[in-house]
């Protein structure tokens, strides 16, 4: 099984670049699962419904986030409605969304866990 992890996709320029390159990369390397960090995919930072949809449409199977996950109030409901959009699992259980997503690949199941490090950052409910 081949996994592709794409780091911070930043703004519409990052989404556009990924849209241009991802299909070819997935095809050339026979990628089975693509995980994309989308927490800065909106203009400025955060994630919006538009940038989440764009990342999904260009081939992200799972979208992870971090400390900018909830920067956009208008997008908060996505964390409870978009199954493959993750917030850090080490946030408090009372925080909206989930931090684990399981993909059924037919021959096996793959769980993607979104953990956030906290070096030089505010502590979390670990």
State what each model feature region is.
Residues 1-126:
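Acidic, metal/ion-coordinating pockets
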């Amino acid at each position: 099984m081949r996994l592709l992890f794409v780091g911070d996709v930043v703004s519409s320029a990052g989404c556009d670049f990924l849209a241009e390159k991802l299909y070819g990369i997935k095809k050339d390397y026979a990628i089975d699962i693509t995980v994309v960090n989308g927490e800065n995919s909106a203009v400025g930072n955060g994630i919006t419904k538009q940038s989440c949809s764009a990342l999904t449409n260009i081939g992200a199977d799972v979208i992870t986030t971090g400390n900018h996950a909830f920067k956009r109030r208008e997008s908060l409901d996505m964390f409870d409605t978009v199954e493959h959009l993750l917030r850090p699992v080490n946030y408090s259980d009372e925080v909206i969304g989930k931090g684990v997503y399981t993909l059924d690949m037919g021959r096996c199941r793959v769980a993607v866990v979104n953990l956030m490090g906290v070096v030089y950052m505010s502590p979390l409910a670990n």
